[in-house]
């Protein structure tokens, strides 16, 4: 009843219901439960006390604000199921959730708004009546003016795609002015923008999250009252990813002369939009030659990008000697191509750098000494080469220097790693090129393999017995194999593994992609819920990448094979003898995938193709994410092309990835919830019967798939949170793991058995070639949010 009166007072324009209860009242005002946990909005005046209770039950209820549980003491507190605010302030506005302890079920979803009737003018109010305060002070009427013009000095905002932009126009006046926003001279309300906008009138601001190139333009704030108006314009430029290989600053690294025993720094300034892979190389002489038989130079890799490297653009040489003299190259590559520049280091005896300008005779003497020193340097270099040659032939006990030719494969792509590559890998991801100023940066047609030995990962080829094929991937095939002695703890036993290899007709790009995937897997490390790298075979034969074997195939087929009997839920292949899956088992599948994605997120790896088909299942029903290291050409996606199994990859893509090709961890969160929908439909196909052309417009309008019949509303609320149009409003994988962990703790095997509850609904037969319209039942036609999530996620997430 209290809620009904409050809502009626809001809609009728009367003062909002006072939420303060008298101390003599036996019952404090309580919110009655609302069916389907619909959001409730209450308007509270500034300074007004608030006292609400969560139903009639005092115990077992907790209040949360913006994802954080309220303390039991303080000005704003949650106490014995009550929400109490001593005096309502602007910062108290926001979303409050009352959750049942244990099950974390949402009892109430409440939004408190501040009544700004004293700071804005209604149509039926006389501005003159607002010129005096309640204390009797009279303020002169004044046209609008800027209160903080110094905060508006930055007129041009140039930001990368995916960032958040905030424009502010703080103003004042009497009567209190209103603010409106224009884009390129037209009224701007954000209704056609993916993710919408946030207009914070109390802060005189416009906020746009996850900006894309279509957001470019001139944004004007128009502030006006009855006495006048003022305006100010901002120019927004959204910077797209630059499709260019790294650019090296001219003149760097620079030729350097140093004395023996001094320290030298060589600087290489790299500009690259995509994450560059940088290496410092020293040119060496082998058997009296600087180049191999194939024309590629011999180089020693001195420094490479790794996770702990913060100054990879600087090469430090300590206590240099004559042997350090020579040519050094800074090599930088990204997904587009390679760039490099070289410099010479000259090392002289200390006395040879004692220059003087006292007399012409002294200058001539210095020149003679310099020439003599150069001759001595050449002799030393020759002696050093002979000595090094003797060391190689004599097999001295000192550790040999790692010398290698430039690896003959291209830098296939930018790793999906924001952090840089690990020092554990000695492999240099560069295509074999001749380091000259005239040749092109990339060569074509190279298919020979010349990979350096990586002792940490190399596995003897003769201990690997290949078996039957398991399938074909994007650029190769996967076969089952038996590896003898793969497990160090069981050196006399064999292990079943999967081996990735190239097809017979593979190109040099296919080779580069496989090498790139191998390197990414080295960098990522090990986790229970991802497919882990076990070893590689790079020497004396084709490249083999050895990974864990998942005996039960991919998750989609795993789910479909375990559908309960029925005419509408039939598997494509043979039915599993294990029987249908229970509800806790399905939640466990989602939980394990979320854990794997949380780990990949911690390693700065963006998957970009998360789906049930890319999750593999082991013999022990452990979920393992696969294909996180694949090179994917996101700028050349055919949106209308089906995969080999008939599914459209775009149906798993977030709107910002689909329309603007912006890939972040939050776009992976969107894909994860499509995967969650697949789980609770037991391998169903997303958006069944919806043509791709129509899907685009439906997603822009905010439509989302309906709740699967066998999915609880709590989990569907979780899906809707992850399908938020604004990426920053989606939960992180860490929050998803915590939420699913709570669900697992709350349910038991008796909670829900799919054998008894699966109804006739089957989304598995839909196909993108269908001519069905958007009226199909798979869509919910209410824009977000349809219903709240039961989990207290924060409203703003960082991507």
UniProtKB/Swiss-Prot annotation:
<dbReference type="InterPro" id="IPR017441">
    <property type="entry name" value="Protein_kinase_ATP_BS"/>
</dbReference>
<keyword id="KW-0808">Transferase</keyword>
<dbReference type="GO" id="GO:0070640">
    <property type="term" value="P:vitamin D3 metabolic process"/>
</dbReference>
<keyword id="KW-0067">ATP-binding</keyword>
<dbReference type="GO" id="GO:0030324">
    <property type="term" value="P:lung development"/>
</dbReference>
<keyword id="KW-0325">Glycoprotein</keyword>
<dbReference type="InterPro" id="IPR013098">
    <property type="entry name" value="Ig_I-set"/>
</dbReference>
<feature type="binding site">
    <location>
        <position position="500"/>
    </location>
    <ligand>
        <name>ATP</name>
    </ligand>
</feature>
<dbReference type="GO" id="GO:0005007">
    <property type="term" value="F:fibroblast growth factor receptor activity"/>
</dbReference>
<dbReference type="GO" id="GO:0005783">
    <property type="term" value="C:endoplasmic reticulum"/>
</dbReference>
<dbReference type="GO" id="GO:0019216">
    <property type="term" value="P:regulation of lipid metabolic process"/>
</dbReference>
<keyword id="KW-0677">Repeat</keyword>
<keyword id="KW-0832">Ubl conjugation</keyword>
<feature type="compositionally biased region" description="Low complexity">
    <location>
        <begin position="764"/>
        <end position="783"/>
    </location>
</feature>
<keyword id="KW-0547">Nucleotide-binding</keyword>
<keyword id="KW-0967">Endosome</keyword>
<keyword id="KW-0732">Signal</keyword>
<dbReference type="InterPro" id="IPR001245">
    <property type="entry name" value="Ser-Thr/Tyr_kinase_cat_dom"/>
</dbReference>
<keyword id="KW-0829">Tyrosine-protein kinase</keyword>
<dbReference type="GO" id="GO:0090272">
    <property type="term" value="P:negative regulation of fibroblast growth factor production"/>
</dbReference>
<dbReference type="InterPro" id="IPR036179">
    <property type="entry name" value="Ig-like_dom_sf"/>
</dbReference>
<feature type="signal peptide">
    <location>
        <begin position="1"/>
        <end position="16"/>
    </location>
</feature>
<dbReference type="GO" id="GO:0008284">
    <property type="term" value="P:positive regulation of cell population proliferation"/>
</dbReference>
<feature type="disulfide bond">
    <location>
        <begin position="54"/>
        <end position="98"/>
    </location>
</feature>
<dbReference type="GO" id="GO:2000573">
    <property type="term" value="P:positive regulation of DNA biosynthetic process"/>
</dbReference>
<feature type="glycosylation site" description="N-linked (GlcNAc...) asparagine">
    <location>
        <position position="308"/>
    </location>
</feature>
<dbReference type="GO" id="GO:0008201">
    <property type="term" value="F:heparin binding"/>
</dbReference>
<keyword id="KW-0675">Receptor</keyword>
<dbReference type="InterPro" id="IPR011009">
    <property type="entry name" value="Kinase-like_dom_sf"/>
</dbReference>
<feature type="transmembrane region" description="Helical">
    <location>
        <begin position="367"/>
        <end position="387"/>
    </location>
</feature>
<feature type="topological domain" description="Extracellular">
    <location>
        <begin position="17"/>
        <end position="366"/>
    </location>
</feature>
<dbReference type="GO" id="GO:0005768">
    <property type="term" value="C:endosome"/>
</dbReference>
<keyword id="KW-0812">Transmembrane</keyword>
<feature type="glycosylation site" description="N-linked (GlcNAc...) asparagine">
    <location>
        <position position="255"/>
    </location>
</feature>
<keyword id="KW-0472">Membrane</keyword>
<feature type="glycosylation site" description="N-linked (GlcNAc...) asparagine">
    <location>
        <position position="287"/>
    </location>
</feature>
<dbReference type="InterPro" id="IPR016248">
    <property type="entry name" value="FGF_rcpt_fam"/>
</dbReference>
<feature type="binding site">
    <location>
        <begin position="470"/>
        <end position="478"/>
    </location>
    <ligand>
        <name>ATP</name>
    </ligand>
</feature>
<feature type="modified residue" description="Phosphoserine">
    <location>
        <position position="570"/>
    </location>
</feature>
<comment type="subunit">
    <text>Monomer. Homodimer after ligand binding. Interacts with FGF1, FGF2, FGF4, FGF6, FGF8, FGF9, FGF16, FGF17, FGF18, FGF19, FGF21 and FGF23 (in vitro). Binding affinity for FGF family members is enhanced by interactions between FGFs and heparan sulfate proteoglycans. Interacts with KLB; this strongly increases the affinity for FGF19 and FGF23. Affinity for FGF19 is strongly increased by KLB and sulfated glycosaminoglycans.</text>
</comment>
<feature type="modified residue" description="Phosphotyrosine; by autocatalysis">
    <location>
        <position position="751"/>
    </location>
</feature>
<dbReference type="Pfam" id="PF07679">
    <property type="entry name" value="I-set"/>
</dbReference>
């Amino acid at each position: 009843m209290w809620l009904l009166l409050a809502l009626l007072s809001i809609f009728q324009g009367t003062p909002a219901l006072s939420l303060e209860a008298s101390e003599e009242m036996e019952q404090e005002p309580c919110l009655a439960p609302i069916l389907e946990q619909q959001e409730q909005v209450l308007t509270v005046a500034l300074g007004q006390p608030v006292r609400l209770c969560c139903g009639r039950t005092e115990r077992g209820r907790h209040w949360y604000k913006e994802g954080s549980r309220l303390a039991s003491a303080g000005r704003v507190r949650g106490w014995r199921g009550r929400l109490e605010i001593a005096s309502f302030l602007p910062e108290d506005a926001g979303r409050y959730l009352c959750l049942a302890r244990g099950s974390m079920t949402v009892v109430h979803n409440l939004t408190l708004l501040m009544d700004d009737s004293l700071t804005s003018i209604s149509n039926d109010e006389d501005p003159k009546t607002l010129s005096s305060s309640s204390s009797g002070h009279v303020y002169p009427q004044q046209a609008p003016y800027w209160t903080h013009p110094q905060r508006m000095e930055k007129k041009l905002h140039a930001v990368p795609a995916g960032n958040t932009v905030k424009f502010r126009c703080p103003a004042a006046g009497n009567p209190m002015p209103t603010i409106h926003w224009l884009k390129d001279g037209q009224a701007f309300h954000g209704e056609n923008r993916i993710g919408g906008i946030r207009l914070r009138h109390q802060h005189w601001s416009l906020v746009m999250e996850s900006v894309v190139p279509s957001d470019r333009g001139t944004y004007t704030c128009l502030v006006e009252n009855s006495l006048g108006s003022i305006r100010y314009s901002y120019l927004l430029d959204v910077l797209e990813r630059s499709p260019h290989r790294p650019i090296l600053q001219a003149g760097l690294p620079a030729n350097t002369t140093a004395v023996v025993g001094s320290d030298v720094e060589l600087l290489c300034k790299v500009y690259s939009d995509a994450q560059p892979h940088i290496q410092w190389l020293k040119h060496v002489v082998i058997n009296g030659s600087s180049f191999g038989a194939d024309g590629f130079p011999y180089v020693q890799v001195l420094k490479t990008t790794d996770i702990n490297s913060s100054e990879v653009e600087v090469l430090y040489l300590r206590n240099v000697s004559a042997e350090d003299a020579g040519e050094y190259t800074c090599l930088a590559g990204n997904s587009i191509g390679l760039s490099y520049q070289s410099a010479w280091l000259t090392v002289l005896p200390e006395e040879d750098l004692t220059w003087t300008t006292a007399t012409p005779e002294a200058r001539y003497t210095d020149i003679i000494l310099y020439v003599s020193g150069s001759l001595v340097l050449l002799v030393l270099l020759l002696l050093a080469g002979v000595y090094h040659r003797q060391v190689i032939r004599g097999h001295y006990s000192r550790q040999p220097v790692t010398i290698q030719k430039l690896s003959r494969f291209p830098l296939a792509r930018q790793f999906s790693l924001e952090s840089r590559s690990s020092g554990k890998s000695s492999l240099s991801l560069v295509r074999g090129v001749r380091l000259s100023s005239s040749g092109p940066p990339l060569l074509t047609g190279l298919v020979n393999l010349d990979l350096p030995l990586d002792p940490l990962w190399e596995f003897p080829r003769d201990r690997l017995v290949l078996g039957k094929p398991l399938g074909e991937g994007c650029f190769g095939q996967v076969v089952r194999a038996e590896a003898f002695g793969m497990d160090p703890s069981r050196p006399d036993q064999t292990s079943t593994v999967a081996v990735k290899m190239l097809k017979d007709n593979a190109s040099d790009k296919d080779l580069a992609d496989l090498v790139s995937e191998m390197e990414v897997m080295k960098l990522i490390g090990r986790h229970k819920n991802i497919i882990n790298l076990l070893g590689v075979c790079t020497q004396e034969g084709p490249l083999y990448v050895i990974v864990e074997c998942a005996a039960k195939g991919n998750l989609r087929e795993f789910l479909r094979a375990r559908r309960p009997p029925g005419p509408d839920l039939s598997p494509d292949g043979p039915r599993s003898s294990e029987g249908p899956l229970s509800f806790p088992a399905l939640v466990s599948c989602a939980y394990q995938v979320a854990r794997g994605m949380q780990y990949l997120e911690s390693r700065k790896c963006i998957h970009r193709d998360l789906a049930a088909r890319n999750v593999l299942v082991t013999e022990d029903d452990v979920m393992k994410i696969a294909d996180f290291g694949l090179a994917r050409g996101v700028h050349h996606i055919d949106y209308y092309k089906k995969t080999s199994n008939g599914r459209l990859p775009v149906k798993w893509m977030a709107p910002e990835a689909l329309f603007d090709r912006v890939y972040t961890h939050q776009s992976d969160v969107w894909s994860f919830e499509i995967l969650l929908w697949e789980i609770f439909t037991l391998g169903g196909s997303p958006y069944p019967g919806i043509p791709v052309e129509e899907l685009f417009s439906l997603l822009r309008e905010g439509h989302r798939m309906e709740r699967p019949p066998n999915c609880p509303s709590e989990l569907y609320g979780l899906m809707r949170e992850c399908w938020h149009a604004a990426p920053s409003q989606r939960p992180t994988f860490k929050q998803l793991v915590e939420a699913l962990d709570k669900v697992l703790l709350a349910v038991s095997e008796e909670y829900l058995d799919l054998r008894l509850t699966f109804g006739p609904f089957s989304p598995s037969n839909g196909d993108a070639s269908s001519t069905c319209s958007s009226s199909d039942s798979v869509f919910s036609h209410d824009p977000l949010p349809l219903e709240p999530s039961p989990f207290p996620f924060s409203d703003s997430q960082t991507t």
